[in-house]
Every structure is written in C-alpha cells, then in structure tokens.
C-alpha cells in the first residue's frame, strides 16, 4: 500500500510498502464447544524510514504469533464462557525507530475472559469480562538500547447487564474497569499516557419497529 500522504508530500519518490503474510490454523467444533487456533507470520518491506538524508523506503520488520479462541457452553446450564489469547512478537525498523525494535503499540500478551449467565425467568443476561495485556514498550533514557522498558500490565474488569423488557425492547447497561485501575498506554518523556477517564458507563435502550420481536426470547 502507499505510504501515508503526509510522508509522500515530503518525499514523492517513496515506494509502496509491502507485506507478505502466512497463516495456518485449525478449529474444532462439537456440542456446545468451539476451539480455534491460528499461527501467523508477516514480513514488511519498504517501510518509511527517517534517515539523516531524509525519508526513504528502507524500513522493514516482521510480526509473528498465535491467536487462540475457546468457546464453551457445556460447563454449566445457562453459562457461556469465552476465552481468547494472543501472543505476538513484533519488530520494526521504520519512521523514528532507527534500529529493529518493538513498536510502542505492540503488546506481547493479550487475553480476555468473558462469562455470560442467562437468568431465564428474569429475561436478563449478566456478563463479566476480564481483560489483560502485557506492558507496552517505551524508551527509557536511563537504560541502553531503544524501546528498552515496559509499562505496567493493562487490566480491566467490566460488567454488563442486558434485559429483555418486552419483545420489542432491549435495555443494556455496562461499566468498564469497575475496580478503577490506573492503566498506562505508554510513556512519553517518562510521563505515563493515561485514559481520559478510569472507567465508563453506558446505558442503551433498543426498540425494534416493524418486526414481531426485537430478540429471540429463548436466548434469555
């Protein structure tokens, strides 16, 4: 694909960036269970790179890892369990990264656990979500090397409630990071990058017009 327009404006001779991707995976599906695994490798060439002489297409990098997903509805009646995990090793030499290193946005471990329990008589689904990510890399000038340190891991516990008020109305409420953890999303000049708010609340009412029902009641 073409480099970002702001880089082309500075250096029109930049080449199109290239990516080669290889994937292999498999899945298993049985009564109430679904498992999936995928391994991947990506190789990047002709990335935009800052040099003393200006912008060039001499950047390169790679990304490899595995994505795992497990879904199980057979552990307990009315309970749905979803577990996902990804492992990623990513390195780039591009833009201001003058040596092959892990970019600021790349986290090595990411995982989430979602539990949904249906209260059939109350026509309500209660959801609990736990999210985790290993620390984001950042440059610590006290240490040698580039992007040589990590922030503390990301963690968030979220809650959600979905209520089928009528056959045509669904009410949904959710709250993120209910434990009010101070998560960092990187550091610049030693100062942590924080979210504008530690947690968020959401309340939505969904009404279906022109149909017999908003949702299949049997799912509640």
Place the predicted regions along the sequence by residue:
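Gram-negative outer-membrane beta-barrel transporters
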Residues: 40-43, 56-139, 179
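Outer-membrane beta-barrel translocator domains and adjoining extracellular loop/strand segments
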Residues: 3-10, 39, 47-54, 88, ...
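Residues that define the transmembrane beta-barrel architecture of outer-membrane proteins
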Residues: 18-22, 29, 60-66, 105-111, ...
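C-terminal beta-signal and adjacent terminal beta-strands/loops
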Residues: 75, 132-139, 161-220
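Outer-membrane beta-barrel strand-turn architecture
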Residues: 18, 28-32, 43, 62, ...
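Membrane-embedded beta-barrel scaffold of Gram-negative outer-membrane proteins
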Residues: 13-66, 81
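Outer-envelope beta-barrel architecture signal
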Residues: 31-35, 77-81, 109-111, 122-126, ...
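Residues on the lipid-exposed face of transmembrane beta-strands in outer-membrane beta-barrel proteins
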Residues: 24-28, 66-72, 83, 113-117, ...
């Amino acid at each position: 694909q073409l480099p970002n327009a702001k880089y082309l404006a500075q250096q029109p001779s930049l080449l199109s960036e290239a990516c080669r991707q290889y994937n292999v995976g498999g899945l298993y599906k049985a009564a109430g269970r679904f498992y999936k695994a995928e391994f991947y490798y990506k190789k990047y060439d002709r990335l935009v790179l800052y040099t003393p002489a200006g912008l060039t297409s001499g950047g390169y990098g790679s990304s490899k890892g595995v994505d795992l997903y497990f879904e199980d509805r057979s552990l307990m009646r009315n309970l749905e369990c979803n577990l996902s995990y990804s492992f990623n090793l990513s390195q780039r030499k591009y833009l201001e990264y003058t040596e092959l290193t892990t970019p600021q946005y790349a986290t090595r471990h990411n995982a989430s656990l979602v539990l949904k329990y249906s209260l059939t008589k109350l026509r309500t689904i209660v959801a609990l979500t736990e999210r985790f990510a290993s620390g984001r890399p950042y440059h610590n000038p006290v240490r040698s090397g580039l992007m040589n340190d990590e922030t503390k891991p990301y963690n968030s516990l979220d809650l959600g409630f979905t209520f089928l008020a009528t056959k045509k109305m669904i009410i949904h409420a959710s709250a993120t990071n209910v434990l009010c953890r101070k998560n960092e999303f990187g550091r610049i000049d030693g100062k942590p990058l924080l979210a504008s708010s530690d947690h968020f609340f959401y309340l939505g009412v969904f009404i279906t017009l022109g149909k017999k029902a908003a949702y299949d009641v049997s799912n509640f």
